[in-house]
Amino acid sequence: MNAFTRAWYALERHYQDTRHVLLRDRFACEPDRFERMHERLDGMLFDYSKNRLGEDTLQLLCRLAETADLEGKMRALRTGAKVNNSEGRAALHTALRLPDGAGAVYADGRDVLPEIRRELNRALKFAHSLDDGSYQGTTGKRITDFVHIGIGGSDLGPAMCVQALEPFRRHIAVHFAANADPACLDEVLCRLNPETTVFCVASKSFKTPETLLNAEAVKAWYRGAGFSESETGCHFCAVSADTEAAQSFGIAAERVFAMYDWVGGRYSVWSPVGLPVMVAVGGARFRELLAGAHAMDSHFFHTPPRRNIPVLMALIAVWYNNFQHADGQTAVPYSHNLRLLPAWLNQLDMESLGKSRASDGSPAACKTGGIVFGGEGVNCQHAYFQLLHQGTRLIPCDFIVPMTAQGVEDGRSRFTVANAFAQAEALMKGKTLDEARAELADLPEAERERLAPHKEFPGNRPSNSILLERLTPYNLGMLMAAYEHKTFVQGVIWDINPFDQWGVEYGKQLAKTIIGELEGGTSVHDASTEGLMAFYRECRLKGGGAA
């Protein structure tokens, strides 16, 4: 039995020994529990004291990380080793946010920092030219709107950042179109003037079908408005690893910005893929976003596991996923501007960790990625929180709470923060049957006994609280990088590759075949798929609609 397996079995035994210990009892017996179980970094506080664990649990989890060679894997990530082994690539998103003056970072024996600096500065310069009006459309009018066309990692990160940083928005309105459903792009175009709009096509391969379909639809929109091909091209820019394909699409080289094959889409907002963020909030604010992410990188790479925020987040998630058999995890930002964070986390975690094969291709030795979902607090308290409080499933919760609202301070911010704190406390403490009876003391005994069981809360429901002094670009960068590194650490513990997504590719392959077959002709699929295709053709014949 190797050291990792021994560490794993030790955690299994520890869970059996401590499974009946209640969180409310831990707090009663450990007055210094919060002091020992929270970490601070700049404007962030991470409280993990409301979790089903003790110091002995943390020691065992850190030992598990040690036997998984977490330190060596972190070094490999930072120095450009090919940690994405299935595709033979590095994963150097941390290099994208290195400050000026940082030492060389190598990928395939080449220092990538000069290229990173060049492309970042080009993108920032273009964003500034839109902002100050020096770049204009073909009719000489100032640009008022910027539409980002991308999907997945080329959409979720930028869209979330633009939404989160709305209070810092400058002059240009930024829009997003991801879905190939015509309603998505049409909803954006109906509000825009083609003379004052610039479109950005973001696709790493420049072959993403949803993105190219929308880009072609925009070209048709310009043709309908009387624009020539060359005039239309002036209203486009692109971000891609295949810069030649972008230029072949009709976009001038000076407006094509490079992505890198050593950065995955869901980690790419720090690259020129973040162009809509640069346009929305300006170059200085974008650099603050990078600086916040770099601060978390430095903390992650140089802090011992027991005090390391992303490592602790990951080990706690492993503790619930693999030893307490949790049914998922929810993330709840108590901030309207952070309402897209759960969708971004959903992709980051589930696309990265939804793997059933170990890094060497053998079957994974344990349960890997879980179901991650979320919603905007306080809204979701009136939706799925009932299940968190009184349901039969274990679903740990992350509360993400800015302390100061980006708006009028009229009591609503205090109400929002109070609700976040109250929900975390209620999940942890619960309400005993006797406490429920005491609340119903004014009722007749029979009625009290009938209602009390329904008002009992089991409690012992775990949560993390991640507090931000304010929702600023810097603090947002720290928050995002913390979750990125958490995802990486979970991949190390489970020995899976968090940087590929082959499961996504298979569906794309089948779709290419089915698209042509929907118009008729020979097709060979299972009976269900054939039936669905037949119904589509039937509806098309009845409606006579366009494809």
Curated annotation (Swiss-Prot):
It is found in: Cytoplasm. This is Glucose-6-phosphate isomerase 2. PROSITE patterns: P_GLUCOSE_ISOMERASE_1, P_GLUCOSE_ISOMERASE_2, P_GLUCOSE_ISOMERASE_3. Catalyzes the reversible isomerization of glucose-6-phosphate to fructose-6-phosphate. Belongs to the GPI family. One of its GO terms (biological process) is glucose 6-phosphate metabolic process. The keyword Cytoplasm applies. It catalyses: alpha-D-glucose 6-phosphate = beta-D-fructose 6-phosphate. The active site is at residues 351, 382, 508. GO terms for cellular component: cytosol. The keyword Chaperone does not apply. HAMAP family: G6P_isomerase. Pathway: Carbohydrate biosynthesis; gluconeogenesis; Carbohydrate degradation; glycolysis; D-glyceraldehyde 3-phosphate and glycerone phosphate from D-glucose: step 2/4. InterPro entries: G6P_Isomerase, G6P_Isomerase_C, Phosphoglucose_isomerase_CS, SIS_dom_sf, SIS_PGI_1, SIS_PGI_2. It is an enzyme of class 5 (isomerase).
